[in-house]
């Protein structure tokens, strides 16, 4: 490895960018496939032609313009272009500073709420998308997790809706893939619309249908929902969505991967055609491009951070592990690397007390649902810290593959003394909120989750992310580590990798464009620099943001944590039982995991053959045990090696033994093969040091569009393909197309295009419509992998085999012609209406005067009880009684002095006479005694 490897890569990348720009300017455009349409560009043309006039927009049906942000140095020019472009639509923007919230033409109410949230300047995605949404354009927004996509669509929607409409009907729908993300979006909508009379509700699975019926009848303006529950209510209540003005698909790629394709298609069929559609996602597979063309009208594509898939402030470290040492590595990372403090007795006691209170509240809620009464007292919760404050200095998320691993790792860490919360897909909603609340409050420092937490859980700032296992997809890895290093903050991502996961790490290397750095490579580079520079040598720093640094934890320290883990496993029977269950779930998980690429598997074998892939990690400094390891390596590589057949055989015994002679002949046969393999390894090592190695990963450094370290960005659709799909009207009118020597219709490269590998990694499923429901990236089914393998089962009642996977469910035909389970229209809403004797207003009609968004919880105005002199609250209760009497209520048994009249009423006199007659009749009986 040469000492100027880093500079060489930079020079190559610059050359690639120059070649890209030349090829882009001379690329061919097909008039038969696409139509000309406007584009808003954020390139350096603003500096060269500052007085260039804006061109009018030209409509197109199948393409949408591209809006990119190339870097921070171009943001000021982009802001000027955007401000001038939308000056006609936003008169207030002329006086405001370009690129600020005021320049978007937002109302004073919205700007005040933005200031209360602490936001001063919009993020790049907000700066680009908000003016477009305000201009009534359909937008496809694309930026990484944590870049402010939620506020990018909530602010303009609130601004355009302004206030509550007296006409009945939903005006805006926001669809989210998970309950957590829906609740997070609802929270932001309420905060940004504070002070207005806009009505917003949230509809998620797991909540009461009757409460959601009440919310829908209250005529909301904005509905934030998960697709499954919203479609359920739409079919059950037979909702008319003709008043919908805005539809937002948040985390759109995840909506399809999670199996919501049928629900989305059904909802699109009932939406009005004149709606404004917004689609936001962290990634944009080619399938979503097709969906955007079909479901959106003349959309604009906004792409940010096209050259970086993860935050440039994120530092990553990858720790190698042996087969049974993954738990010990996790304990070592938490204790020695992150410096995670153990929980004190007071903290553990406080945490248990809160769990007990929450359980009591859950039981009370169940009793309320059964009896209909309201509880008298609710425990007061502490206020959460602000969005830009860490819950704790060591707050860490640990990602595990399945639900069983969540239970196993949670039990292990709690036994080790850590304060742990946990979340998985099928966890009860009440328990999920409590666990997240404890972590947000800082009462727990570790949150163990499955991939369901990679999106949607509202944790604004996080210190560390730990991958207990490396995910099988580079896309999942991006969304995992996207939880930290947000909003300009630094963060660490630690991953534990075994030899079976090494090919996936090499896939990640190609996907991110960041090379793997081994300890031996760094030491060799330092030695070359030391020999070259002499006394002026300064050891280069390891860039954990630019390289994937791979190595192992210190062996001596790791053995200590291995002993700790063995002791915990021995002393806790429950932990050993959960471990067995997690091991079975892990087998099913690996069985359904997507296979790594063939090239990465080959490279992984080459790296493991070198024997240096599990050297001590550079994060822990020099290895003090290296001399000992070198000595052991010499013993392992000794020339005279004896097998068990030859051991302790000497002299004539050695010559006469048939097994000894057999091993001698075997060595002669293998000697040429071993010699050739050794020569090949030495040759590869010398070529690698001299920089002569030429593989697929090196081809990309000099040719555009080949496999290897690509700089095409987070989307799997490369730049050349996007330019062919979505034409640029300015380039067509101002530049003449140059002819290319190759015809794309017939040219076949001898290397696979870079888009093929990235398409495989971004598109977790091969088919958009048919295979979305059975996607391997199914975050909610983290405990159901591999279920339902047996198809035919014996039915004792029917006396024959039946299909166990078939059900007797009945279906109804939806608006789009697709079949929907008949349970969606079960008649519960009709029963609810009949019980309350009400009829919902017709969509489009005006609200009646009695309608209100408020729900009256208390209708009775009962008088207080009489005060008891022997109770502590006697005086307090006495004041309540006196106040009730003054207000005109009758308190039974209480009579104020002078309040009662001495004159009896006719009714009292009549009752007294009857009572007297009864007494006389009773007392006037003849005596039973004898006279």
Curated annotation (Swiss-Prot):
GO terms for molecular function: ATP binding; ATP hydrolysis activity; identical protein binding; RNA binding; RNA helicase activity. It is an enzyme of class 3 (hydrolase). Residues 1-78, 836-910 are annotated as: Disordered. It comes from the Eukaryota. ATP binds at residues 143-150. ATP-binding RNA helicase involved in the biogenesis of 60S ribosomal subunits and is required for the normal formation of 25S and 5.8S rRNAs. This is ATP-dependent RNA helicase DBP10. It comes from Scheffersomyces stipitis (strain ATCC 58785 / CBS 6054 / NBRC 10063 / NRRL Y-11545) (Yeast). The lineage of its organism: Eukaryota, Fungi, Dikarya, Ascomycota, Saccharomycotina. The gene is DBP10.
């Amino acid at each position: 490895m040469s000492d100027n490897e880093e500079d060489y890569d930079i020079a190559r990348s610059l050359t690639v960018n120059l070649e890209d720009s030349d090829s882009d300017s001379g690329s061919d455009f097909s008039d038969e496939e696409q139509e000309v349409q406007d584009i808003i560009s954020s390139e350096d043309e603003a500096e060269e032609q500052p007085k260039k006039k804006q061109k009018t927009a030209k409509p197109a049906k199948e393409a949408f313009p591209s809006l990119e942000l190339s870097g921070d140095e171009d943001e000021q020019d982009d802001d000027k272009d955007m401000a001038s472009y939308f000056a006609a639509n936003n008169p207030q923007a002329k006086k405001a500073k370009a690129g600020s919230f005021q320049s978007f033409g937002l109302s004073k109410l919205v700007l005040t709420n933005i200031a209360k949230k602490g936001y001063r300047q919009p993020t790049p995605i907000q700066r680009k998308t908000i003016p477009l949404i305000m201009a009534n354009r359909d937008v496809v927004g694309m930026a990484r997790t944590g870049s402010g996509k939620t506020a990018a669509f909530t602010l303009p929607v609130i601004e355009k809706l302004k206030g509550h409409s007296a006409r009945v009907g939903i005006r805006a729908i926001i669809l989210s893939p998970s309950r957590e993300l829906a609740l997070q979006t609802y929270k932001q909508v309420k905060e940004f619309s504070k002070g207005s009379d806009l009505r917003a509700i949230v509809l998620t699975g797991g909540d009461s249908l009757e409460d959601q019926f009440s919310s829908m009848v209250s005529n909301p303006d904005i509905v934030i929902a998960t697709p499954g529950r919203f479609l359920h209510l739409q079919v059950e209540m037979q909702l008319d969505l003709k008043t919908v003005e805005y539809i937002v698909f948040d985390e759109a790629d995840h909506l399809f991967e999670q199996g919501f394709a049928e629900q989305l298609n059904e909802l699109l069929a009932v939406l009005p055609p004149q709606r404004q559609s917004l689609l936001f996602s962290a990634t944009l597979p080619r399938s979503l491009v097709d969906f955007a063309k079909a479901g959106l009208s003349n959309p604009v594509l906004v792409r940010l951070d096209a050259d970086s898939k993860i935050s440039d402030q994120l530092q990553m470290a990858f720790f190698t592990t042996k087969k049974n040492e993954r738990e010990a590595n996790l304990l070592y990372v938490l204790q020695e690397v992150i410096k995670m403090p153990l929980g004190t007795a007071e903290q553990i006691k406080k945490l248990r007390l809160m769990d007990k209170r929450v359980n009591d509240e859950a039981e009370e809620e169940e009793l309320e649902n059964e009896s209909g009464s309201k509880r008298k007292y609710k425990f007061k919760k502490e206020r959460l810290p602000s969005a830009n404050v860490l819950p704790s200095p060591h707050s860490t998320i640990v990602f595990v593959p399945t639900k069983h691993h969540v239970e196993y790792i949670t039990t292990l860490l709690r036994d080790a003394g850590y304060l742990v919360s946990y979340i998985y897909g099928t966890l009860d909603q009440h328990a999920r909120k409590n666990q997240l609340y404890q972590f947000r409050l800082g009462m727990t420092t570790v949150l163990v989750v499955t991939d369901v937490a990679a999106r949607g859980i509202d944790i604004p700032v996080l210190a560390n992310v730990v991958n207990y296992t490396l995910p099988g997809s580079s896309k999942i890895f991006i969304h995992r580590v996207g939880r930290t290093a947000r909003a300009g903050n630094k963060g660490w991502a630690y991953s534990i990798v075994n030899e079976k996961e090494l090919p996936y790490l090499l896939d990640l290397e190609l996907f991110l464009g960041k090379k793997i750095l081994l300890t031996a490579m760094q030491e060799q580079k330092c030695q070359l620099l030391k020999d070259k520079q002499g006394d002026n040598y300064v050891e280069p720093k390891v860039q954990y943001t630019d390289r994937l640094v791979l190595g192992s934890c210190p062996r001596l320290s790791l053995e200590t944590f291995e002993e700790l883990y063995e002791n915990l496993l021995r002393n806790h029977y429950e932990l050993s039982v959960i471990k067995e269950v997690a091991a079975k779930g892990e087998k099913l998980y690996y069985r359904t995991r997507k296979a790594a690429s063939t090239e990465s598997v080959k490279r992984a074998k080459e790296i493991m053959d070198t024997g240096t892939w599990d050297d001590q990690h550079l994060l822990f400094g020099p290895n003090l045990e290296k001399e000992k390891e070198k000595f052991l390596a010499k013993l392992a590589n000794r020339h005279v090696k004896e097998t068990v057949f030859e051991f302790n055989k000497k002299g004539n015994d050695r010559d006469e033994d048939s097994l000894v002679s057999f091993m001698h002949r075997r060595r002669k046969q293998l000697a040429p093969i071993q010699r050739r393999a050794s020569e090949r390894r030495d040759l590869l090592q010398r070529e690698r040091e001299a920089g002569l190695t030429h593989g697929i990963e090196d081809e990309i450094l000099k040719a555009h569009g080949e496999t290897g370290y690509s700089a095409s960005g987070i989307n799997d659709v490369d730049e050349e393909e996007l330019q062919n799909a979505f034409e640029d009207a300015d380039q067509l009118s101002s530049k003449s197309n140059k002819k290319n020597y190759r015809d794309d219709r017939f040219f076949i490269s001898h290397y696979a295009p870079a888009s093929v590998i990235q398409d495989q990694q971004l598109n977790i499923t091969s088919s958009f419509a048919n295979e979305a429901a059975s996607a391997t990236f199914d975050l909610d089914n983290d405990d159901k992998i591999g279920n339902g393998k047996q198809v035919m089962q014996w039915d004792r009642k029917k006396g024959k085999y039946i299909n166990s996977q078939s059900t007797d469910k009945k279906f109804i035909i939806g608006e789009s012609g697709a079949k929907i389970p008949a349970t969606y229209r079960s008649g519960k809403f009709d029963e609810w209406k009949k019980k309350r004797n009400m009829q919902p207003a017709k969509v489009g009609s005006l609200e009646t005067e009695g309608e209100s968004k408020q729900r009256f919880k208390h209708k009775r105005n009962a008088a207080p009880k009489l005060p008891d002199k022997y109770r502590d609250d006697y005086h307090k209760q006495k004041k309540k009684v006196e106040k009730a009497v003054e207000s005109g209520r009758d308190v039974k048994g209480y009579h104020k002095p002078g309040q009662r009249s001495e004159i009896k009423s006719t009714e009292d006199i009549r009752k007294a006479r009857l009572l007297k007659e009864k007494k006389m009749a009773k007392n006037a009986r003849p005596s039973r005694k004898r006279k």
